[in-house]
């Protein structure tokens, strides 16, 4: 059991640091906040609950050999002034924040949950379009 928990913690750490150190540095050099940093600024401290942190793309196409966690978008919910909101934040450090199949599924799931509870959705966009390697589903 301890091995499985250690594996889960390692995967979670990989997801939190999904972008390469160089891509993180480039974002900061441009004066941009990272996806998680934007969420932290927006929401009440400690309120963010992430959905599907360990999601990865399923594409078999060339050019998509890497399979970082999050698939380029952070999704979840938190509060602003104590009121529940759902949020997604594109992660430019992972695939340039480009839309893919799993990326879209994560946003769709988050929007469905927001609709069920009557909470607003906030999108923090910083992406490079769509991953056409994944075909029409992206």
Where are these regions (language model features)?
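Terminal-region recognition feature
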Residues: 1-138
């Amino acid at each position: 059991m301890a091995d499985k928990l250690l594996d889960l913690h390692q995967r979670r750490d990989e997801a939190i640091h999904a972008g390469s150190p160089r891509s993180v540095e480039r974002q900061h050099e441009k004066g941009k906040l990272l996806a998680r940093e934007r969420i932290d600024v927006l929401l009440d401290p400690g309120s963010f609950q992430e959905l599907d942190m360990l999601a990865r793309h399923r594409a078999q196409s060339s050019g998509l050999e890497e399979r970082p966690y999050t698939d380029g978008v952070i999704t979840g919910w938190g509060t602003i002034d104590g009121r529940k909101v759902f949020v997604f934040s594109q992660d430019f450090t992972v695939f340039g924040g480009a839309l893919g199949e799993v990326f879209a599924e994560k946003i769709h799931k988050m929007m469905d949950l927001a609709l069920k509870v009557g909470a607003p959705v906030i999108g923090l966009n910083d992406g490079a379009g769509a991953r056409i390697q994944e075909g029409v589903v992206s």
